[in-house]
Amino acid sequence: MKVVVQRVKRAAVTNKSIHNEIDKGFCLLVGIGKDTTEADIDAVAKKIINARLFEDENGKLNLNIQQVEGQILSISQFTLYADVRKGNRPGFSNSKNPEEANVLYEKFNTALKAYDVEVKTGEFGTDMEVEIINDGPVTIIYESQDGKII
């Protein structure tokens, strides 16, 4: 599992059927790989919720998303598993098949919500417009394999 976490002042996702937006918080680009398990979902969700990526009164990254009452915008992003080693067109054989990936993506969002953080989402498997106003910028990539952060 790969998740790109961007600290944002505002973020929005739109397609033909939905429009969701958040203010201060995280915009997550969530990739579900062919080897992603529920243990990875839990490990990454916990790590992101506890990540101290917001400044305290002294300007140090000391506060987590719960402490700043931030929100999360979670967007599925299978292209995080692109294989670009051969040719000029990326391959996506390292991504989990869409049906299984959607189940794990929903479980990931449920795991985040279990920490009493407001989570909004894009629509799995559709083309979307994503609008992000980064804060910092602070961008961190979290990866998990076999239930462990790598």
Swiss-Prot record:
An aminoacyl-tRNA editing enzyme that deacylates mischarged D-aminoacyl-tRNAs. Also deacylates mischarged glycyl-tRNA(Ala), protecting cells against glycine mischarging by AlaRS. Acts via tRNA-based rather than protein-based catalysis; rejects L-amino acids rather than detecting D-amino acids in the active site. By recycling D-aminoacyl-tRNA to D-amino acids and free tRNA molecules, this enzyme counteracts the toxicity associated with the formation of D-aminoacyl-tRNA entities in vivo and helps enforce protein L-homochirality. It is found in: Cytoplasm. The lineage of its organism: Bacteria, Bacillati, Bacillota, Bacilli, Bacillales. Its EC number is 3.1.1.96. Homodimer. GO terms for cellular component: cytoplasm. It holds the Pfam family Tyr_Deacylase. One of its GO terms (biological process) is D-amino acid catabolic process. Keywords: Cytoplasm, Hydrolase, RNA-binding, tRNA-binding. Coiled coil: none annotated. It comes from the Bacteria. It catalyses: glycyl-tRNA(Ala) + H2O = tRNA(Ala) + glycine + H(+); a D-aminoacyl-tRNA + H2O = a tRNA + a D-alpha-amino acid + H(+). This is D-aminoacyl-tRNA deacylase. A Gly-cisPro motif from one monomer fits into the active site of the other monomer to allow specific chiral rejection of L-amino acids. Its main location: cytoplasm. Belongs to the DTD family. A motif (Gly-cisPro motif, important for rejection of L-amino acids) lies at residues 136-137. One of its GO terms (molecular function) is Gly-tRNA(Ala) deacylase activity.
